[in-house]
């Protein structure tokens, strides 16, 4: 985890609820977050040229979470491909949310194309 020294900034992002995820690709910072849809959360995002902003709202990244009120993003690069991780409320073992992965990102100059679930990764107990 990285900590920045300075004053705490409050960002006024449309539909923001919780669960921010910050990452950098090239020279651009991306802030992805859980946002309120019509009854369930979805993901929206904003971009900035510096970590201190000014942040530009870019819109929805996903539709509403399936089977769940909550959805939190995690975006990572692995072997040259970008992936979006999130969860829904399908229960696999006990009370833990089921993790999901949406396919490889398609990037344009400043935006991420809207994501559609690609493959479900289920954590299964092996005996």
Q: What is the role of each PLM region?
A:
Residues 1-127:
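Carbohydrate-active catalytic/glycan-binding domains of CAZyme proteins
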